[in-house]
Amino acid sequence: MRIEYSSRPKLYTRIIIPSKSGSAFQYRSTTCLHHSQKPTWVSSLDLGAKMDPAIKSELEKYGDDVLFRAVTNHTQSTWARTFHSSPELFIQPQSIAEVEKVVNLARRCRRRITTVGCGHSPSNITCTSSWLINLDNFNKILSADRETGVVVMQSGIRLYSVGEQLDAVGLAMPNLGSINHQSIAGAISTGTHGSTLRHGILSSSILELKITLSNGKTETCSPDQNEELFRASLISLGAIGIITEITFQAVPAFTLSWEQTVDTDLRMMNNWDKTLWTQTEFVRVWWFPYTRRAVVWAAEKTDLAPMPPPKSYYDAWLGYHVYHNLLALGHYVPSILPWVEWFVFGMQYGFANGSKSSAIQPSRQALLMNCLYSQFVNEWAIPISKGPEALKRLSSWLNHLTPDDPDYVAHGIPYSAEGLYVHAPVEVRVTETSNSLTPRPHLDPTCTEEATLYLNATLYRPYDMDPPCHARYYQGFEFLMRELGGRPHWAKNFETTGEDIEAMYGENLENWRRIRNDADPEGMFVGEWHRRFILGNGPRLALEEVETGRKKFRKGGVLVEGVVGGFKDEEDEGEGSESGESFDMLRASEMK
């Protein structure tokens, strides 16, 4: 055993335990609250004692030099600090061989594996008490062909790094969502999209994937090779395997000239079927329900020299903190929120209709927006033709409109909005996948018969406080979205039942389940979120993680706890693979 010391006294940085056959195990003890933080090393003469002896025993049997980079005492948090979990091990592989080793070890040790990137999904989809893999150190662009635009990259690379490195060789991603913190694999796996009728969701640009399955083997899939696995893995929700390598179709780097205009929501909706969504290549809208106004952001490619955007109220220190504290005040006095919308809207975009601002920026900057504070986000995809109806009904409900109001429509939402005050804006975006020539993911939420409209109802959590309107607002919002034929964004917060999801996806969901079960028959990549929303009421799987409880977390949100195989009875648990003998039997069977 070799111990390497840090420069700080009495703190150990890592322990390397070589096995008899020369294999290596890199192990650290840390109290990180988020994987983006540097580990805080704790004093311990025997860090290895913190690991399950069965896992240590199995590690020592490996006859290779492939590292197992594991961390204990890690608490994983979503970016919004809505959910937290304490995995048994937090693992950061740096090669496909290391990923395969983690999967093989997990199978022998009867552990579930969850993969996490930046944690920007505010749901509990990545919560685990078992093993958590993060690929932040598996983040290289392996090749980029400027002539063809074909780029091969490791799956842990963040989108901002993709943009920076592609720009250096004259390339760019054809489209981006509102943020670029996600890993490329995480963005693909949840159906990330931008806002344009000339592009589909991010996975539309994927040419090929490599994915490590529960048997420890890495498979290549594409439209021409393993097409069914490819279609299932494009939106895998982390339940099929670990995406390790991505081949992506980039485009020549481009600059966008954008302009945003304040107007009434009535004028915006009257232009809905005319030029609203086709005036430029990229268009998005922020709708403010209480002031009944909208900001229309439109961008087109240009060869003009860059021109920085005007200073944003949100981005200035004073504006950022004033808004944050007004939201916090609204937590206790919700009735001020319509005024907060009017004030902050005016300071950010202008108080008068017709107010404009503009800029010229590289696409990788122009397409982004500041997410500001911790938040819940509930986004649904509906047919674009249903957009005006959706906004008018939501406005009538939130504003308690009566038939004598010229903007009144019957909202039909069977929940009271009395005393309900929400945050703004509602983000309105579009994609077009109905004419796509590329294979559709089985769990693609977009429309097949027409373009897709996304409505994103954001609720901020000022100082990590859940807004009092949260449950009722989303209850009414989701009712409306379901009535209009909508489907929820997989990475966002939603409460729609698994039965509703089955009705929405039908045969596509059945096909996805079949492919998933073939790739991972024991449920190594399955957790409570998957069971609740997409796996239905079928039998629990051997390595499936079951949620056992939730606790209030000391810094806001909830701590989710689970157990692998928690559905088994005591007799079954007594027959699990927790002995060295059973590990050897598993290993022997795999080598046949």
Segments (PLM) and residue ranges:
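Noncatalytic alpha-helical scaffold of FAD-dependent oxidoreductases
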Residues: 2, 12-16, 25-27, 31-592
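Low-complexity, intrinsically disordered Ser/Thr/Pro- and acidic-rich segments
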Residues: 21-23
